[in-house]
Amino acid sequence: MKQILRAFLFLLLFTATVNTAIADEKANVTKQGTVRGRIIDATKQTLPGASIYIEKLHTGVTSDVNGFYTFSNLDPGTYTVKVSYVGYSPVELKITIPAGRTLEKDVVLNEGVELQEVVVGGAFQGQRRAINSQKNNMGITNVVSADQVGKFPDSNIGDALKRISGINVQYDQGEARFGQVRGTSADLSSVTINGNRVPSAEGDTRNVQLDLIPADMIQTIEVNKVVTADMDGDAIGGSINLVTKNSPYKRTIAATAGTGYNWVSEKAQLNLGFTYGDRFFNDKLGLIVSASYQNSPSGSYDTEFVWEQDDDGKTYVNDYQIRQYYVTRERQSYSAALDWDINANHKLTFKGIFNNRNDWENRYRTTLKDLDPDGNATVRIQTKAGTPDNRNARLERQRTMDFALGGEHLFGALSMDWHASYAKASEERPNERYIDFQLKKQKFDMDLSDERQPFASPKTGSTMTLNDEFSLKELTEQQEDIKEQDLKFSANFKLPFKNGNKLKFGAKVVRKTKDKEVDFYEYSPLDEDAFMTNSLANTVDQTNKNFMPNNKYQAGIYASKEYTGSLDLNNASLFEKEQVQEELAGNFNARETVTSGYLRFDQKLTKDVELMTGLRI
C-alpha cells in the first residue's frame, strides 16, 4: 500500500508541476484547442500507423493501433493537415481549430495507384497497417498483422512469431511453444497482451507458452527488440506484445472453418472461428466478440541419443531412446472488447481474453540405459498415461486470462490514459502416471557409422520389447497445480509541445502471487508376480512400418494406456503407497510487489532526426 501511495503522490506532484509550467508559458492556455479523430479507409477499416502532419507547425503524429490521432495545445486558427499511409493516396485538408474546444475530424483515405491495363486483386489492408506502424515507430520494432498471419497455416501465435526476423522458437510436438528474441533465453523476454504482461504457468521460469493462444484471436503482433523507458523494464531480449481485436468502425461478421488430417494419429483436425463487431448509440459504443476452437489429434516418432567419450577418447552412445507419442490438443479462446466515447475528450475501454488448452499425451518409450562401449545396457520400457476420466492420457490443462479496464482523457494539452487489470495463468496436471519395466545385463551390437542415426541390434538372448523376463522398475503418479495472478494499475501522461517535442511520464504498480504444489507418489504392488502377469496380459504393440524412414527403428510392445490408467493405486490391499519427499522441495508460495515510474522525452532535432531519452525507476 505504501508503494501505491508513493506512486500516486509522484504522479500528482509531477502533474501539478507540468500544469504550472503550461500556465506560465501562456496565461490564456484555456483558449487553445485540440483536434482528434480517426484515420480510416473507404471500407471504414481503421488505419493504425498513419502519418498526420501539420505543415504550419512542422510537427506530426501517428495514429494508434485503433487508428486514432490527437493534436493538442493548438492556437485557434486554420491549419493545413497532410495525411499519408503506405498503399493509399495522401490527403491534404484544412481544419479550423476552435478556441478552448476539441474538434473531431475523421479522415478517409482511398486506395493508391490504379492501373488501367492490369488489374491485380488482393487484400493487403493489414499488411499496410503493419508496414506503417513499423515505419513510424521510433524503436526497433517488427509488426505483423492478422492477414499476414492468415496467409500461413499457423494454428497458434508461436507458429506465427517464427516468421519474424530476429525471432526463433522452441518446439513441442511440431508446434512453436516458446519465443526467443535476438537469441536470448525465452525467460529473458516478456510477452504481453495489450501491453499487460502475461503471467507464466511454468513452475520454475517466466516462460509463457505461446501455443496457448490461437493465431486468429490476435489483430496485431508487435515485437519490440529495444525496450524503451515507458515499457516494463523486465525484458533483456525484447518484448512481444499481442494486440487483441478492437471494436470496428462498422459492423463486422466473420466465420472460418478448416480441417486437416494427421498421418501419425490417423485422425482429422478441426478449426473453427467466429467474430462479430458493431457500433451502437450513434457510434458512441463499440463492441467486438470473438471465439475460436481447435481440436488437433497428432503424434510423432522420436529417437534421442546421448553421446559420451571413454578414457581413450573414443565416442559411444551412452543413452539410446526410441519414443512414440500420441497427442491431442484442444484449444478454446474467447475475447471481447468494448469502447465508449463519452465525448471528444474522454473515452472508456474494456478488453478481456480467456484461453484454455487441454493437452492429452501418451508416450511409449524404450531406453537402453547406461550403455557402455562394449554394448552392455539395461533395457527400460515405459508407458506414460492417465486415469480414465482423462482419456487414459496425461492431461496438461493450461489457462490464461486477462481483463483490463482503461480510460483515455484529454485535459487541455495534457493527455492521460490509465489501466486497471487482472491476469491469471494456471496449469493442472492431474493423475499423471508412469509405469516402467526393466531388464538388466543385455548386450547389443552398435552400428555407429551414421552419427545421426546410430543403431542398436540385440545380440542372441537379448531383447528390446516387453516380455516375461522384465520386472517392475517403478510405478508413479503425480499431481501438479501451478497458479500465477497479477493485479496491475498504471497511469501514463503525455504532453506535446509546439516544436514537435513530447514529454511522457507515468507510474505502474504490480502485485504478483505465484503458487506451486506438486504431490509425487511411488507405488509398490504387494503381489509383484500377479502384477507382472496382469501387466503382460494388457499390452499394446506400437510397431509401425512407417515409424521412421527405411523402417530402421521400431517402438515395440508396452503396457497399454488403458491398463495403466485403470490401476487402483489407492487400494491399500493391492499397493503400498509412499510420498517422495524430495519432490516437495520444489513447492512454494511467492508474493511480489513492484512499483515503477518513468520519464521519457522525444526531441525533434530536424525533420528527419529525433532523439529519445528516458529514465525508469
Protein language model features and the residues they cover:
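N-terminal periplasmic accessory domains that precede
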Residues: 103-107, 157-160, 177-180, 192, ...
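Transmembrane beta-barrel wall of Gram-negative outer-membrane proteins
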Residues: 267-367, 398-405, 412
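Short acidic/polar hinge/loop motifs at secondary-structure boundaries
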Residues: 72, 197-225
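Predominantly transmembrane beta-strands of Gram-negative outer membrane beta-barrel pores used
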Residues: 190, 220-224, 239-245, 252-311, ...
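Short, acidic, small-residue-rich periplasmic hinge/interaction motif at the N-terminus
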Residues: 24-32, 36-45, 50-55, 84-88, ...
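Flexible glycine-rich, low-complexity coil/linker segments exposed to the extracellular/periplasmic environment
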Residues: 445-474, 528-586
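Short, acidic Ser/Thr/Gly-rich low-complexity loop/linker segments typical of extracellular
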Residues: 57-68
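Extracytoplasmic beta-strand/coil segments of soluble accessory domains associated
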Residues: 158-197
